[in-house]
């Protein structure tokens, strides 16, 4: 499994995202640059320029027509994927830490930072695909304010029914996506260990969280029941669920500030594969020289990518043994 090394960033990666077809990969980092890559060969398609601060987050619409980015310059920008032009800028009072399109692409959520007297909030923006994308709404159609603990990450559940948010205090909440009312709140991780990532299954009925408390949890979108727990030996920055095979991929490593002159092995800078059902670790992929900040998987389950503190994105296309590997019980199930 030889990785394709994508070097288009000068500073550490913050998020990577495959589009729905899996032919494109978008990456953002702390150097203000947004890159688009071909997944198959790692060739860079181009960049989206305009942000004035670190770009924390990126998402691409389900039809790969629009790209959204959120940045430390307190703005969300909407880009035309094909031409690279910025079609809309929304200004916020604080930095934007996470953006995500709803499953039908008609709305975009933005998670804003708690700072300078402003409470953390989740804003929902309505997205229009008419008139060359020029007439976007100026104000959010819904704003959810986090009075208790600020939201660090958020996403949409199945059919865009709920907004699921992970918080700084390790809890996960479920909000009604129409009204913004909080329906559920579960202390999924150790108290005060923030949730660094939330990624959904393909049908969005369950999701995985990655936390500073060195664990990842598989949680149901409907009632926030904790289904599985994956325990690692290092703080986790990102986690994703693989289609095709029942695995999850976790990425982490010692926080950059805690790393002294450790070797890559000691820093535990590897992508870890766990069995989704049995919760066992089944393998690791080394390569990054520094913690993994973000992992993403190809929607067909044929490849995965990781973005590190070292400024590189590594794309791995899976080999045959990856797909052939099975537990004995899984084999027996196949025979029946």
Curated annotation (Swiss-Prot):
The keyword Oxidoreductase does not apply. PANTHER family: EUKARYOTIC TRANSLATION INITIATION FACTOR 3 SUBUNIT I. Component of the eukaryotic translation initiation factor 3 (eIF-3) complex. GO terms for biological process: formation of cytoplasmic translation initiation complex. It comes from Aspergillus terreus (strain NIH 2624 / FGSC A1156). It is found in: Cytoplasm. GO terms for molecular function: RNA binding; translation initiation factor activity. It comes from the Eukaryota. InterPro entries: eIF3i, WD40/YVTN_repeat-like_dom_sf, WD40_repeat_CS, WD40_repeat_dom_sf, WD40_rpt. Keywords: Cytoplasm, Initiation factor, Protein biosynthesis, Repeat, WD repeat. Coiled coil: none annotated. Component of the eukaryotic translation initiation factor 3 (eIF-3) complex, which is involved in protein synthesis of a specialized repertoire of mRNAs and, together with other initiation factors, stimulates binding of mRNA and methionyl-tRNAi to the 40S ribosome. The eIF-3 complex specifically targets and initiates translation of a subset of mRNAs involved in cell proliferation. Its main location: cytoplasm. This is Eukaryotic translation initiation factor 3 subunit I. Belongs to the eIF-3 subunit I family. The keyword Protein biosynthesis applies. Gene3D superfamilies: YVTN repeat-like/Quinoprotein amine dehydrogenase. WD repeats lie at residues 8-47, 50-91, 146-185, 190-229, 287-326. GO terms for cellular component: eukaryotic 43S preinitiation complex; eukaryotic 48S preinitiation complex; eukaryotic translation initiation factor 3 complex, eIF3e; eukaryotic translation initiation factor 3 complex, eIF3m; nuclear periphery. Pfam families: EIF3I (PF24805).
